[in-house]
Amino acid sequence: MFKRKSAPKIRLLFVDENNDLQSNIAEYFVKEMYGDLYEVSSAGPKSDCVDCELISVMYQLGYDIRSYTSMDFGHEDLPKGFDYVIFLEKSTYDRVKDDIPFKAPQILHDFGRKENFEKATDDVELYECIKQLVENVGEWCKSTFEDPEALKTMVV
């Protein structure tokens, strides 16, 4: 007869430098795994195209991010309020943590940048590097966001 009002979703913002790599992976996995718990966005201090190799590798793995777009912090489609801002690159965190336009607790988990792919000498090795990043971010998302209360313990 009466519907119980559900708790509001926790609002997350995933950040990497250009909103082109690991922030999109994290956004995808948290939406897929825990969309009932979280409202998820991603952005960066700068925007670029979402990494083409990432889109291709994720699609080959069965994860479709072809509709994702890169946004900077000032993008008009980016929500304005967040419960947590989650940096996925230490270098970006160190550079902008005090100047971001969002006043929310910050979490840092460093997955590095594309420089980690420099060891790839051909397309097969590049595929494996990106696949490993996707798997690492996916596993981290699975374990990290399962319990929303645990986020409080990760704030830096």
Indicate where each model-derived feature is located.
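Conserved active-site segments centered on acidic
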Residues: 1-78
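Structural signal for conserved beta-strand scaffold positions within catalytic alpha/beta enzyme cores
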Residues: 42, 87, 107-110
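Phosphate-binding/catalytic loops
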Residues: 96-156
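Mid-chain, well-packed structural core segment of small domains
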Residues: 78-101
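Residue-level detector of flexible, active-site-proximal loop/helix-junction positions
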Residues: 47-49, 92, 112-115
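Short glycine-/acidic-enriched loop or helix-start segments at secondary-structure transitions
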Residues: 24-26, 52, 93-99, 118
